[in-house]
Amino acid sequence: DSISQHEDLTVVPLLVMKDGESFTDGVDVQAETVYQWIDAKHKVTTSQPSIGTFTEHYERLKEQYDIGFAIHLSSELSGTYNASVQGAEIAGFRLIAIDSRCGIYPAGQLLAEAMQLAADGMAVTEIEQYILERRFDHHIEFTVANLDQLQAGGRISSTKAFVGNLLQLRPLFHFEEGKIVPYQTVRTFKKAHGKIYDHLVEMLESGTVTDVSLFHATAYDLAFEWKTNLEKRFDVTVRIDNLTPVLGSHTGNPAIGMSFLNPTSRR
C-alpha cells in the first residue's frame, strides 16, 4: 500500500466481469462485493486491461518520463504483460516490461525493490537485469475451501470439482514456471491450510526469511491467528493482505495463502 501512493507509480487495474458486465478491480468493485457475487452464484470472471487502455496511459506518461518500468502478473495467468508491451509500442513510449512469472504479491515486492534501487541511483538496465533474476526467488502457496470458482475459471474440470467437493478434497497450489499448479491434495480445508502453515513455519525456522505476506479471501481471522503466532515465535514481519477482486474471483472463498521473496544480499 505504501508504494501504491508513490508519485511516480501508475497502476492499471484489471477487470472483473459479473454476468458479462465489466467492473474495474479495486475501483468500481471491492473484494467483499465480488465474494458476495460468487456466493450468489453469479458468473464471475476476469479480463486484462485492453491494449487501448495501456496506450492511453503510456501516451500520457511519455509527456513526463523518458522511460517506464513495468512489472506484470505472470503471462501464464493473464494477457496483461502482452497488452502492456503492445500499448507502449503504439504510444511510442520506451518501456522495460517484466513478466514476473508469479502472482500479484511477490510482484508487488519486486516492484518495491526496483523502486528502492532506482532511488539508490542504480541504472535502469541494471535494475532490469536484477529483477529478471530476482523474480525466480518467490515462494507462494495457497489453498481454497471449495472448488467451484476454480472450475468456473477453467482451472479444473467440472468432474474434478464435483468429486473434490463431494469428498472434501482440497488442493494445495504453488507456482511452477509462471503457472498455478496443484502440488498436493488433502482431505478438508482445515488440513490443507494447516499444511501451508506448517510449511511456512519450516521455512521461518531456517532464520533467513524475515518478511511474509499472508493473503486471504474472507479468512481474516485465520490469517490474523497465523500472524499473531508467527510474530510471537519468530523475528519476522507478517502482513495480511486481502485477495484482490481479480484473484478472489479465481479462488472463491474462503481461501488463504502465503508468499515471500527469498532474502537477497542487496537488502
Residue ranges and their predicted role:
Residues 32, 36, 52-59, 82-86, ...:
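N-terminal, well-ordered alpha-helical segments
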Residues 41-75, 128, 135:
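Glycine-rich phosphate- or other oxyanion-binding loops that anchor nucleotides, phosphorylated ligands
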